[in-house]
Amino acid sequence: MTDTVHEQDSGATAGQAPSADEGLPSTGEESPSADEELSSAERNRRTRERRIAVHRTARRVLNRPGHLHTVRERLALLDDVQDLFDLDGPVDMYGNGVVEALEERTAGLLGLEAAVFFPTGTMAQQVALRCWAGRTGDPVVALHGLSHPEVHERNAFSRVSGLRPVRLTSEPRPPTAAEVRDFEEPFGTLMLELPLRDAGYVLPTWEELTEVVAAARERDAVVHFDGARLWETTTHFGRPLEEIAGLADSVYVSYYKSLGGFGGAALAGPRTLVEEARAWRHRYGGNLFQQFPTALSALAGLERALPRLPEQVAHARVVAAALREGFAAAGVPWVGVLPEVPHTHEFRVWLPYDAEVLGEASLRQGEETGVLLFSGPWDPAGPGISVAEVGVGVAGLEWTADDVRAAVAAFVAALEG
């Protein structure tokens, strides 16, 4: 499924079926014309504009992600930030000032020695793994086949940073300790994405995570966490952030995923690694002149959004159960909610209908009732099967289980209408 703030590789995304004619001999039919391709692009553009309009006018939604807001609404995130940082002090230049304050706050929350701000997570992780490769003498990075660098970053590890990713597994679950311990070739770094978004925001149990880390240590490998959404994991693991982050040698976190900031990321770990990463950040073009709007929005997210995430995770479990009950009561042949009990405040829903049909029903429900049950796109996941992501944000905390079941009934009515 397409996340509007992520770059996508060409080809099918995780969880989607390949094109129906992929790998088959030509039927002799002509390829779509440029006009048809343009028409398809125009259709997609109009659908997106319609989705944004419905989202903005809906009186009730489960989540209000930042990329669907107006500029004015996003600027409101900086209201009252004077309580978080002295706005009468000097503005930041090349990473000092408010950026340094954000780095210190992040390192403290994660219980790690230091942190360095990056404009993107893609850059942060390339720098982290490049630094570890230099220290271990091994450019091989063991990771999951559905991890973000493999699916969404256009092979940047190998093309830009000289790293060689190897896949422990591509199954829609976290890698196991046995897969790490018994992998057939050496690797210098193990990268774990927590949660694994393209497998459905899944997490291992705490015991499984510690066993996987121990298996990597047995191989003398460094452990790096792709923790873009690590902020969401404390409820599932039953551990504080600093204990979770403390399992790894380095951790990347995002300031817009989960926290709703304007953008940005941080790499946290030993002070010597962080200082080396600053040099590489400059070489990669990431040492921007001023970052105060983004840094202030990140501080606001840490102060306001982070404390509410456990409540959202708990309520996502209520919403997921009510969705299953609602679709069963409406007579839908089957529904998949994965994970069955969400590990974070985000999960996936699978239904036995074409994506275009489900997308149209979602929009029509929002337009006609003011209630938007599925605010994101539906994507094909096989013949006659589609999948959508559901996130329970602060707005979703207002929904009761009865509200969800009623919205499902209205959605199915729109589907059949």
Q: What do these predicted ranges mean?
A:
Residues 43-49, 198, 203, 246-353, ...:
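Active-site C-terminal subdomain of aminotransferase-like
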Residues 173-228, 232:
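Active-site phosphate-binding strand-loop segment of PLP-dependent enzymes
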